[in-house]
Amino acid sequence: MLSTTAYKDKFSGYTYFTPGSGYSVMKQFYNREPRFYLGITFQNRRWDFDNSRTYYTVMSFNGNSGPTGNTHDYPIFGTIGRKPLSEGTTPSGVDNAVIIRLGEVYLNYAEACCELGDLATAIHYVNLIRSRAGVAEYVGLNSEDQTARDARGETRIDLGNLTQDLVRKVIYRERIIELAFENKYYFDVRRWGVADMAQGDGWIYPSWHKGGEGGQMVGFNVSNLGTTEEQKNVQMNFYKRVQTQTRVFTKRMSFLPIPQEEVNRDLEIVQNTGWETDTDEE
């Protein structure tokens, strides 16, 4: 654990560990890309409210945001989104709701370019997003910019030969990260037709995961499961990965069924795949 040096958020510059505070942050949360810190509240993350109060989010079993502290309202996976909240937000604060923003427009355009076969332009607009976020840009054999380093001096990530399938995966991954907690992912994976992916591809779902939106969901050990000895050190036991849920997702769940009475009224209406009945087929 990072117990001797101050941990600074690369995006905001805030220090999340203060010597003598009694709170520390695991190395797995250290030196991640800026969008991670913008979007995720993790164990022992520090909040600064109106420059007068400091709050640490503790999601382990006996923490202020764990099962003991919040019996009916705690993050079962051990992390929670923070993107919609400003650092100074309090329970009585007011924030504006974002309907659409430039990042989504760029990604929508990149996806359209990819499907039309204009791969160089697609990567260009993905790179605009990554540059704004402070992470290394991509380069490919047929991309617009062939320089080894981007405008910020970061070494570009070499994708090699740009194929439509590869660029499509790059865009999908970028949408998942850039638009996290913005109510896009749920619809994206269904629109892409991947929500029932049998085996993770390492882009949309982790390579070890099976079942797409279904299957085994894992998270941190919020409930302090384990041996009696392990349970004694609640903070450390929290970081053990455990299965939190088993979800079921089948292909038909990508669409809601058309009400059967509507289908019965008009024989030209085709019921969504997986929701057909014997009545439809007669």
Q: Where is each model-derived feature located?
A:
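Acidic/polar-rich alpha-helix caps and helix-coil junctions
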Residues: 1-282
